[in-house]
A protein has these predicted regions:
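N-terminal beta1-alpha1-beta2 module of alpha/beta enzyme domains
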Residues: 1-69, 173-175
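Alpha-helix-loop-beta-strand connector modules within alpha/beta enzyme cores
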Residues: 56-77, 134-141, 309-321
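Active-site mouth loops of central-metabolism enzymes
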Residues: 12-26, 80-87, 173-183, 265-276
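Hydrophobic faces of well-ordered beta-strands that scaffold small-molecule active sites
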Residues: 6-10, 43-45, 75-77, 105-109, ...
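Short, acidic/polar
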Residues: 22-35, 90-93, 181-190, 274-284
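Conserved, mostly hydrophobic/aromatic
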Residues: 66, 97, 107, 142, ...
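Flexible, glycine-rich active-site loops centered on histidine and acidic residues
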Residues: 2-23, 83-152, 201, 207-211
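An alpha-helical appendage that flanks or caps ligand/catalytic pockets
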Residues: 2, 127-169, 202-291, 301-304, ...
């Protein structure tokens, strides 16, 4: 069986630690360093420019800073919004980060979904079909920039001519490409064509995840690619709240859950349980061929859940295998 990996999705835009409400890079850095110490495989950041009035640091700049203070843990995006950056420039940024981090980049990319965010920053927000077409072309350009001496491309949405990206990424042939999204007609076809890893974030049920895998497998057949070449990744829950005492844990969830949300609804999209409960749920996905799990700890920046999961699951992975 392939190695099972656990990565942490870090909602760094949610941390308000100063009187002005500004995000604290020091806090983000300390959480990432703790993830590295505990043995997590990766930390992935979301790529948003604004979320209502919440403070948020720019994703790629933050990753660059984190890469200079860490040594082993892999760093990347879940996912980088294609609409925000020219793909040739994004390829250059990613190659630079892979060099700074000595080959630790996880490159996640998606078509973009937040219309208000695009409008506020002046980015076009065309139809879903057009955004996915753009993402497909962007990935083709990025792969060319990473692997060719001079890259040229003449597509419907993007054109480059003799573009040089030096130095190339440390990872060969290139950093792993994660394509985010679950659209069955278009996005999963792009995933079948280009992705090294499939991850759509949180899926509401094991049955829905099975369905997405079947659709992806059909697209792989259509484009002439082996379904087994693509690593399978998933989120076992929208948010994870893990504790040794379930009764005390549920009290904490009541304190941490968003105001105005019904507890039953919140529990349906979250995992609330003991390490043993979590292992049972993870095993179900392992049996489907999943080898990579993304974890969104709902109690961050409190480190108790992060540490408990590492001590009882990450460091005892043989129990799952």
């Amino acid at each position: 069986m392939d190695e099972i990996k656990f990565g942490v999705f870090l909602p760094f835009y949610a941390f308000r630690t100063t009187k002005t409400g500004s995000s604290s890079f020091n806090l983000i850095r300390d959480i990432v360093l703790e993830c590295e110490r505990l043995g997590y495989y990766s930390v992935l950041l979301d790529d948003h420019l604004m979320l209502k009035k919440m403070p948020i640091l720019e994703c790629w700049t933050t990753l660059s800073a984190l890469s200079s203070v860490t040594e082993r843990i892999r760093l990347g995006t879940m996912i980088s919004c294609n609409s925000f950056r020219n793909p040739a420039l994004l390829a250059k940024m990613a190659a630079t980060l892979d060099n700074i981090s000595n080959g630790r980049l996880e490159f996640g990319i998606g078509a973009g979904v937040q219309k208000n965010e695009h409008n506020a920053y002046g980015f076009p927000f065309p139809s879903s079909k057009a955004r996915i077409e753009r993402m497909n072309e962007a990935v083709e350009i990025i792969k060319k920039m990473w692997t060719e001496e001079k890259a040229s491309y003449n597509g419907k949405h993007y054109t480059i001519k003799n573009a040089v990206c030096e130095p190339k990424p440390v990872q060969k042939p290139h950093p792993p490409i994660i394509i985010g999204g679950g659209g069955e007609k278009l996005t999963l076809r792009v995933t079948a064509r280009h992705a090294d890893r499939y991850d759509w974030g949180y899926l509401a049920s094991l049955e829905l995840y099975k369905r997405k895998l079947k659709v992806l497998e059909k697209h792989c057949e259509a484009v002439g690619r082996s379904f087994h070449e693509i690593e399978k990744s998933c989120w076992p829950a929208g948010q994870i709240f893990i504790g040794e005492n379930r009764k005390e844990l549920e009290k904490r969830v009541l304190q941490l859950m968003p105001k105005g949300v019904i507890l039953e609804d919140f529990m349906q999209t979250s995992f609330v349980g003991t390490p043993e409960d979590c292992i049972k749920q993870i095993r179900q996905y392992v049996n489907l061929g999943v080898t990579h799990f993304m974890l969104f700890f709902g109690d961050l920046p409190d480190l108790r859940g992060l540490r408990l999961f590492a001590e009882n699951i990450v460091r005892k992975i043989d129990q799952i295998n």
